[in-house]
């Protein structure tokens, strides 16, 4: 079973993105995981993500993103076919009111077991919630493209997106901004992978 786990480069003036550390840690810890870091660029992220999906042909894909201001790990349920960039990407581009895929469905639902993932995280002491908006920036963009590839090409078999909060070192100069330890974020994403693996394995046995 092949699992593609993606994160993003830093953006929006931050000098780090914890998803890079999560991807690195779990790529080393879980043999089935292939880790990739996507650029915060609508043009380059599209090119890289679609190429990686074609090259790896994963059974499971979980895209990760940083959500400044969120208090919990957020397991996203839906991606919409809309780009409405609130800030420029790292190439200085700021597209608005554009579809991700011309003529594509208005939205896709995550196909990983989102509720089960959240419940398992909570059982392990990790603050987690279901989320119904992945935004209209690069995170939603990656989630939609992955699910569109799944729907049109058959791989990955299941996919979804997880947002993580800032880590404590990122909020030292940001008053009243929530954070979560990197270790807890890594543990949460590892749980998500294990739950997704189990769900896919069970479905293949039916």
Swiss-Prot record:
It catalyses: Release of an N-terminal pyroglutamyl group from a polypeptide, the second amino acid generally not being Pro. Keywords: Cytoplasm, Hydrolase, Protease, Thiol protease. GO terms for biological process: proteolysis. The active site is at residues 76, 139, 163. It comes from the Archaea. CDD domains: Peptidase_C15. SUPFAM superfamilies: Pyrrolidone carboxyl peptidase (pyroglutamate aminopeptidase). PROSITE patterns: PYRASE_CYS, PYRASE_GLU. Pfam families: Peptidase_C15 (PF01470). One of its GO terms (molecular function) is pyroglutamyl-peptidase activity. It is found in: Cytoplasm. GO terms for cellular component: cytosol. Homotetramer. Removes 5-oxoproline from various penultimate amino acid residues except L-proline. Belongs to the peptidase C15 family. This is Pyrrolidone-carboxylate peptidase. The lineage of its organism: Archaea, Methanobacteriati, Methanobacteriota, Thermococci, Thermococcales. The gene is pcp.
